[in-house]
Amino acid sequence: MKIEYNHAFGLPRNLVWKWLKDETVLKNSIPNCKSFVETSSGVYRGEIDIRIGPINDVFAIDIRRLEEKNPSFYRLKITAKSKLGNIQAQSDLFLRDWQGACKLTIKADVVITGTMEVTPDRLLNGAAIKVIENLFQNLEKEIKKAVYQSRKKFRT
C-alpha cells in the first residue's frame, strides 16, 4: 500500500526540523500513545493503542531514522507488531519552505501482514491518513508549546 500526505505547518522549517526529533514532543503528538522512548540516537520504541473499525489492538512500534539531510529530508523504517499482525513501512519525509512556513510531504510504502491483511485497502489507507493527519496536527501544537516554554524559561 502506498500512502502520500501533505501538511502545512504554521512554523519555520528550522523549528519543525529541530522538534521533529524530540522524544517528548513526539510522544505527546502520537495519537493514543501509551509509551515512547528514544533508546539510542534515531531509534524510538513504544506502544500505541490503535482503534480503527475492525482493528483494535495495542501495537509495539519501532521507528528508526535511516537517513537524514538537514533540514529537508528523513527516511524512516517503521515496524509495528500486534496480535492482529504486523506493519512494515519505509517512509520518506520531505520538508521545504513554503509561504514563509514549512510544508511536510510524506511518501510511504506499507506492507501489512496477518489478520489485518484482509481489511480492504481503502479502509486501511483512509485510517492511516487520519492517524497521520492527527499526528501532524498534534505535532504542530506540541512544537508551538515547546517553543513557548523554552522562550518563557529563557526570559526568567
Predicted regions mapped to residue ranges:
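Hydrophobic ligand-binding cavity/cleft-lining segments
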Residues: M1-V43, E47-D49
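A generic beta-sheet turn/junction motif
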Residues: F9, I52-P54, K69, S82-L84, ...
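Glycine-rich portal/gate segments that line the openings of hydrophobic small-molecule binding cavities
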Residues: V37-T79, N134
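Beta-strand/loop substructures that line and gate deep hydrophobic ligand-binding cavities in soluble
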Residues: A80-A127
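A conserved amphipathic terminal alpha-helix motif
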Residues: M116-T156
